[in-house]
Amino acid sequence: DRVYVHPFSL
């Protein structure tokens, strides 16, 4: 699981 997910996809 991701600890932090970016609000936007790179």
Swiss-Prot record:
One of its GO terms (biological process) is vasoconstriction. Keywords: Secreted, Vasoactive, Vasoconstrictor. It is found in: Secreted. It comes from the Eukaryota. One of its GO terms (cellular component) is extracellular region. Belongs to the serpin family. In response to lowered blood pressure, the enzyme renin cleaves angiotensin-1, from angiotensinogen. ACE (angiotensin converting enzyme) then removes a dipeptide to yield the physiologically active peptide angiotensin-2, the most potent pressor substance known, which helps regulate volume and mineral balance of body fluids. This is Angiotensinogen. It comes from Gallus gallus. The lineage of its organism: Eukaryota, Metazoa, Chordata, Craniata, Vertebrata. The gene is AGT.
